[in-house]
């Protein structure tokens, strides 16, 4: 009887190892090639009652910079979205901005021309700084999520 129980344990352990093999084979998520577009989703959660103010400030003081990045080739596309339905407060986000960069290197490094572009786009730097400060004052949360497109190619 002792041998039978020991053999059963070995068979169970082997069965578990065989069943778990596909899990171990999955590995980490696919990463885009260095020369491929790289997408990041930026989520914004504003204070209740200030969502529209946040969006107006974003469109006035940040979106033009993103458009400049499209012109220079740093960014491929920008998409601004909001959810169609309500969520629980802990899961709530008000705006998602998806930016497709030309490649991962451009997405993860600062633009050396950013300060110059900001001064060019907003000559009244005092007003720009004041409005940007306000935009971040009414922001409750912000997080970035790099995403990988896994859609099969035809």
Predicted regions located by residue number:
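N-terminal secretory signal peptides that target proteins for export/translocation
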Residues: 1-7
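Residues at beta-strand starts and edge strands
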Residues: 8, 36-40, 93-95
């Amino acid at each position: 009887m002792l041998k039978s129980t020991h053999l059963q344990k070995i068979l169970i352990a082997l069965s578990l190892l065989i069943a778990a093999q596909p899990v171990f084979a999955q590995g980490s998520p696919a990463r885009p090639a260095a020369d491929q577009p790289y997408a990041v989703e930026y989520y914004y959660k504003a204070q209740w009652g200030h969502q529209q103010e946040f969006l107006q400030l974003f469109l006035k003081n940040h979106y033009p910079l993103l458009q400049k990045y499209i012109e220079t080739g740093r960014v491929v596309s920008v998409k601004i979205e909001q959810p169609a339905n309500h969520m629980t407060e802990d899961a709530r986000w008000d705006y998602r901005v998806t930016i497709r960069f030309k490649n991962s290197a451009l997405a993860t490094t600062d633009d050396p021309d950013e300060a110059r572009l900001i001064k060019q786009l907003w000559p009244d730097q005092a007003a720009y700084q004041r409005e940007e400060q306000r935009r971040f004052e009414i922001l409750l949360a912000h997080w970035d999520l790099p995403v990988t497109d896994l859609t099969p190619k035809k």
